[in-house]
Amino acid sequence: MPPKTSGKAAKKAGKAQKNITKNDKKKKRKRKESYAIYIYKVLKQVHPDTGISSKAMSIMNSFVNDIFERIAAEASRLAHYNKRSTITSREIQTAVRLLLPGELAKHAVSEGTKAVTKYTSSK
């Protein structure tokens, strides 16, 4: 038979239980968007035995965000100059050619074209 508790002790136990259930609700964490998993996948393709520190990953993430922002801004400017309201792959391609130097631009354009072709063929 369980030991009997006094009326006050039972009330206190009940209150404690209520407090736990009130404060027990988990706060929903806001997701941090990052290119970390994609940067890591590319790193492993290029150098399978190499790791990356969290600080280096943060720098790479900032770099990718910066480049994408620059490309988007340049593509927007190009669309505005040509009185267009839509940014197409053509504007993106031209923006890349304007922003990236020489051989890097050629490689970026060819990889981008390949990605767009793969995407449209999979539909």
From Swiss-Prot:
There is a cross-link at residue 118 (Glycyl lysine isopeptide (Lys-Gly) (interchain with G-Cter in ubiquitin)). Its main location: nucleus. Keywords: Chromosome, DNA-binding, Glycoprotein, Isopeptide bond, Methylation, Nucleosome core, Nucleus, Ubl conjugation. The modification N-methylproline is found at residue 2. Residues 1-31 are annotated as: Disordered. One of its GO terms (molecular function) is protein-containing complex binding. GO terms for cellular component: nucleosome; nucleus. Phosphorylated by the catalytic component of the Dbf4-dependent kinase (DDK) complex Cdc7. Monoubiquitination of Lys-118 by Bre1 gives a specific tag for epigenetic transcriptional activation and is also prerequisite for histone H3 'Lys-4' and 'Lys-79' methylation. Deubiquitination of Lys-118 by the SAGA complex is involved in activating transcription of a large subset of genes. It comes from the Eukaryota. The modification N6-succinyllysine is found at residues 44, 114, 118. It is found in: Nucleus; Chromosome. CDD domains: HFD_H2B. Glycans are attached at residue 110. The nucleosome is a histone octamer containing two molecules each of H2A, H2B, H3 and H4 assembled in one H3-H4 heterotetramer and two H2A-H2B heterodimers. The octamer wraps approximately 147 bp of DNA. Belongs to the histone H2B family. Core component of nucleosome. Nucleosomes wrap and compact DNA into chromatin, limiting DNA accessibility to the cellular machineries which require DNA as a template. Histones thereby play a central role in transcription regulation, DNA repair, DNA replication and chromosomal stability. DNA accessibility is regulated via a complex set of post-translational modifications of histones, also called histone code, and nucleosome remodeling. This is Histone H2B. The lineage of its organism: Eukaryota, Metazoa, Ecdysozoa, Arthropoda, Hexapoda.
